[in-house]
From Swiss-Prot:
Belongs to the acyltransferase 3 family. The keyword Transmembrane applies. The lineage of its organism: Eukaryota, Fungi, Dikarya, Ascomycota, Pezizomycotina. This is Acyltransferase clz18. It comes from Cochliobolus lunatus. It comes from the Eukaryota.
Length: 469
């Protein structure tokens, strides 16, 4: 008896949702670095001193720096590296935003029976909802830090209280994150006005990241939301500009735009355009089996080429992970990346350029690597993907508010004198913080994100032009 294959009920882009969930946890891991340093410093000091100290005077930091090569192991480094994760987030956004457009263009080239007005209405609806949803949720994420700041629970001078001096950028270990938060004002009215001004920063998307007023200070991670909104506008304009072009011409123009964006120092726009290129490639690959099946009247048979394609994509995925692992700090001390320096002698390539290239390779290949795709489509990854945006928005405030004291409290009981006790204390504290972030993210999604999404949908329906009967 021949059994019919069980159809896969998951959407074709389900792995994208799971990948987003895993990336949100990677960023959570990355932001633990300064928290661990302060927690260890508090429990390891015999007496409190506010005299200027170098962060390298902390034994844990000095030990990590002396063994820096262990923290530059390719692929393993991705577990706690924020920059590659952010680059992949941007590429995914460009990919998802372009999928519908690519499908429309392909369908239009095959048939003229297309309701153009309906298509443009769908595009407009997507832009309206996405922009408003991101903006409202970003502003909502600043309310809790605002309350913690005003009530005195959170103190932006915690690093100065440890007596740690500010070092050059590469040696700060993200300890300057506390300084990015605003000062506490005397009255609630002044603090509220300051919050409103920071909320308004969400819409100033054309400012540069180096400008002091770019990032909303009540939640510094929101700089990526502003960059996302700016790149979304650039991508939408490009969608309209290339509406009447052939696929080959589109790919050439997009590649040129991406290279130009990298040359002028842009991070997010080249990644959005690269996401569009990958959407074009993936869609063309999906159409090839269908075209072959129609031509022969038979379903396409699997051949050895499928296995070779999987092997090739696995190699590309591994290469992408390797490139994305390029160290941000002291890359010359990472012997496993000497190949990069040999390939570009005398040329200084910013680490984020390598991270961007790695992110593009990962997004291009992951879909066709069965093991990687199954991981992203697993129930755990899908759950994290459902809450990924909430995790990203709320984790930073929780980590820097509770993290240092929690690490020091746990280490004071488990001990911190040897590697075993240090690891046990880290595992306990990490588990507590991780569960707290997941619980808070679930609450945020249930009571803030979902109502905001419904409100935006309702607002668009009430504002849209209705068809006449």
């Amino acid at each position: 008896m021949i059994h019919k294959p069980i159809p896969n009920s998951k959407p074709l882009t389900a792995y994208i949702d799971g990948l987003r969930g895993l990336l949100s946890i990677i960023i959570f891991n990355a932001h633990l670095t300064p928290v661990i340093i302060l927690g260890y410093d508090k429990v390891s000091r015999s007496q409190v001193s506010t005299s200027p100290r170098n962060v390298l005077d902390i034994p844990l930091v000095a030990s990590c720096v002396n063994n820096w090569v262990l923290f530059t192991i390719p692929i393993l480094k991705l577990v706690y590296s924020a920059s590659p994760a952010v680059c992949l987030f941007f590429a995914i956004s460009g990919y998802v935003m372009s999928l519908k457009w690519v499908r429309y263009m392909n369908h239009r080239s095959q048939t003229s029976e297309i309701n153009s007005a309906r298509i443009f209405t769908d595009f407009g609806s997507s832009i309206f909802r996405r922009t408003l949803r991101l903006s409202l949720l970003a502003m909502a994420s600043m309310i809790v830090p605002f309350a913690l700041m005003k009530t005195g629970f959170f103190d932006r001078t915690v690093v100065q209280q440890h007596g740690l001096t500010k070092l050059e950028r590469g040696m700060r270990f993200w300890l300057e994150q506390w300084e990015q938060f605003p000062a506490r004002h005397e009255s609630w009215w002044e603090q509220t006005c300051d919050l409103v001004q920071n909320c308004a920063r969400i819409f100033t998307v054309f400012m540069q990241r180096r400008d002091e007023a770019f990032s909303p200070r009540y939640n510094p991670v929101l700089w990526t939301i502003k960059a996302d909104l700016r790149a979304s506008l650039a991508l939408t304009v490009t969608h309209l500009a290339l509406l009447g072009t052939k696929r080959s011409s589109r790919l050439q123009i997009l590649a040129a735009l991406a290279v130009l964006g990298v040359a002028v120092g842009s991070l997010e726009c080249p990644l959005f355009w690269a996401g569009w290129i990958i959407a074009e490639i993936h869609h063309a690959a999906e159409q090839t089996p269908l075209a072959q099946g129609k031509g022969t009247g038979q379903p396409r048979q699997k051949t050895n080429t499928a296995g070779m394609d999987t092997f090739g994509k696995t190699v590309v995925l591994a290469l992408g992970c390797y490139v994305a692992s390029y160290p941000t700090w002291k890359p010359e001390k990472a012997p496993m990346f000497n190949t990069f320096h040999m390939m570009t002698p005398g040329l200084i390539v910013p680490p984020r350029t390598w991270h961007s290239l790695g992110a593009v390779l990962v997004l291009y290949s992951l879909r066709d690597v069965p093991l990687a795709r199954r991981i992203c489509e697993s129930s755990v990854a899908q759950f994290l993907g459902t809450h990924s945006f909430a995790i990203y928005l709320i984790h930073f405030c929780l980590v820097i508010s509770f993290g240092p004291d929690l690490f020091s409290w746990v280490w004071s009981r488990t001990g911190h004198e040897n590697l075993q006790s240090l690891a046990v204390g880290f595992g306990i504290t990490y588990s507590i913080l991780f569960m707290a972030v997941l619980l808070t993210a679930a609450i945020f999604r249930r009571f803030i994100e979902s109502p905001v999404n419904k409100c935006v949908d309702s607002l668009y329906r009430s504002a849209s032009v209705r068809k006449e009967a």
